[in-house]
Amino acid sequence: LETIGSTGSPLVHESFDYVYNHIKKDVHLASLSGGTDIVGCFVGGNPISPVYRGEIQGSILGMDVDVFNDDGQSLVNEQGELVCKKSFPTMPIKFWKDDGTKYHKAYFDKFNNVWNHGDYILKTINNGFIIYGRSDATLNPGGVRIGTAEIYRQVEQIDEVVESLVIG
């Protein structure tokens, strides 16, 4: 076993620990994130860079991924919106039966013609990424952004809770 891939939701610290403590200490754990709308990934693993607990290794070849605050400024070590600053090979060109209005509003309105994917993310000092979930599923009480993953992590520590659903 050389590589384990993970996708579908953010890979939490506990999952990294489980893989390295119970499956194999020297396996390459490659988490990735993208979308069905792009038929691909924005960020993911590669076989030559180090793997850091809780981080996705970096952006995928051909993707100019960045993290923007609400003013469109690049962030490092702060949470913000996942954006792709240049066109990419799998970028959809339009929506079916749309004159371009819905397509532009879905991806390009927020940051003036920069693709905004709608994921809440952090770029680390290692040039890795941590995904916190969908930005439209992020709660913002008193100006403090809380992703649903953080709420689930706390709620699921309660033995009496079998299943939960966070609604903002």
Model-derived features with residue positions:
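Hydrophobic alpha-helical scaffolding
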Residues: G5-S9, G54-I56, K85, P141-V144
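Conserved ATP/PPi-binding loop(s) of AMP-dependent carboxylate-activating enzymes
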Residues: S59-I60, Q73-F111, I146
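Flexible loop/turn segments at secondary-structure boundaries
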Residues: L11-E14, D37-G40, S74, T90-P92, ...
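AMP-binding/adenylate-forming catalytic core of the ANL superfamily
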Residues: F88, K102-K105, N113, G118-G168
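Short coil-to-beta-strand transition motifs
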Residues: I56-G62, W115
